[in-house]
């Protein structure tokens, strides 16, 4: 179906294995709460990997500002449809550097995530707002790693903070499209 499956790690170090060497060639998405010496060493290494080939988010991803929203509307119009054809057309214009395979992965992942929201009773306007956030964040925050989605050396995302529901949805999209994710919650549960 064009989406990466979330895999299970045996040990933290599995995060650093190439995609082709993993069972089911899966991505990893884990929440880390609580520390030990081993976890601290892993996080240090993962942080370095994310800085080299990925994105480190400390705190929150800022909401799109008025300039970013205006630019999106100017470039893409303000219409929205929960439809793979519509999303493909929009992503082709908005993120032209994605390969066809990467674009399809992002579209499939975004469609699945928006359908999940719809199944949980979110209305058209809420879905449109989610779509606008995703598009702005992909462009302004994650654009430099999108071209590496699904490669053998998967891009790494480290989210260090308390994740919001929109942010979590976007991280799920990125994982489904071919990125490894670690959510670090220092406050624990």
Predicted segments with their positions:
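Conserved N-terminal ligand/cofactor-binding loop architecture of enzyme catalytic domains
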Residues: 1-13, 19-135
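Short boundary motifs at domain starts and secondary-structure transition points
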Residues: 12-22, 142-151
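Active-site and donor-binding regions of nucleotide-sugar-utilizing enzymes
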Residues: 116-189
């Amino acid at each position: 179906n064009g989406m990466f499956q979330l895999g299970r790690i045996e040990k933290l170090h599995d995060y650093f294995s190439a995609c082709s060497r993993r069972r089911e060639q899966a991505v990893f998405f884990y929440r880390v709460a609580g520390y030990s010496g081993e976890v601290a060493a892993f996080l240090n290494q993962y942080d370095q990997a994310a800085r080299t080939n990925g994105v480190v988010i400390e705190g929150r991803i800022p909401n799109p500002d008025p300039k970013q929203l205006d630019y999106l509307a100017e470039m893409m119009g303000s219409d929205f449809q929960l439809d793979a054809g519509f999303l493909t057309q929009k992503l082709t214009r908005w993120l032209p550097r994605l390969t066809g395979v990467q674009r399809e992965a992002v579209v499939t992942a975004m469609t699945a995530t928006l359908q999940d929201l719809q199944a949980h009773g979110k209305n058209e306007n809420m879905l449109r707002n989610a779509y606008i956030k995703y598009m702005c964040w992909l462009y302004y925050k994650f654009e430099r790693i999108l071209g590496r989605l699904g490669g053998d050396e998967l891009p790494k995302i480290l989210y260090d903070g308390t994740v919001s529901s929109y942010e979590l949805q976007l991280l799920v999209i990125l994982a489904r499209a071919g990125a490894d994710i670690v959510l670090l919650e220092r406050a624990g549960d």
